[in-house]
A protein has these predicted regions:
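Vicinal oxygen chelate
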Residues: 1-7, 29-77, 85-112, 123-134
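Conserved active-site tyrosine of GNAT-family acetyltransferases
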Residues: 18-23, 88, 116
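Short glycine-/small-residue motifs
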Residues: 118-121
Length: 134
């Protein structure tokens, strides 16, 4: 199999709100949009992030069209998580979790978009210990 592109599609109540949040806070760019659909991209991200309106008439399978994303983390690995924390805090973005460093070397914090999608910014500050590497 040869994968030529990839995308993550999330079903939310208001795709425009989620798209604006990622455009304004994280520099994503709108690649295309239509009623109930927004596709975002960034040159340094390997996938498109797509927001679909819950109940969208063209959603397949149809019996799942009304469900919204829950328990989803969109993880963005950055060079300097502390600088991103300060930037977002200064901009008035609500921070869900303060910066934490896990024993496996992941330093992160979380924010939430208007539809409840959690965006986690991560910086790897140390190699994970052998006990957690597969």
């Amino acid at each position: 199999m040869s994968i030529t592109a990839s995308a993550l599609s999330l079903t939310v109540a208001d795709p425009e709100q989620s798209a604006r949040f990622l455009e304004e806070e994280f520099g994503f760019e709108r690649e295309m949009s239509a009623d109930g659909f927004v596709s975002l991209t960034r040159p340094d991200v390997a996938f498109n992030l797509i927001f679909l309106r819950a109940g969208l008439e063209t959603f397949k399978p149809r019996d799942r069209a009304g469900r919204t994303a829950a328990g989803i983390l969109v993880v963005l690995v950055v060079d300097n998580v502390d600088a991103e924390y300060e930037r977002l805090h200064a901009a008035g973005t609500e921070i869900l979790t303060p910066i934490e460093t896990e024993e496996w070397g992941e330093r992160f914090f979380q924010v939430e978009d208007p539809n409840g999608v959690i965006v986690q910014l991560v910086q790897w500050v140390a190699a994970p210990p052998a006990s957690v590497v597969a």
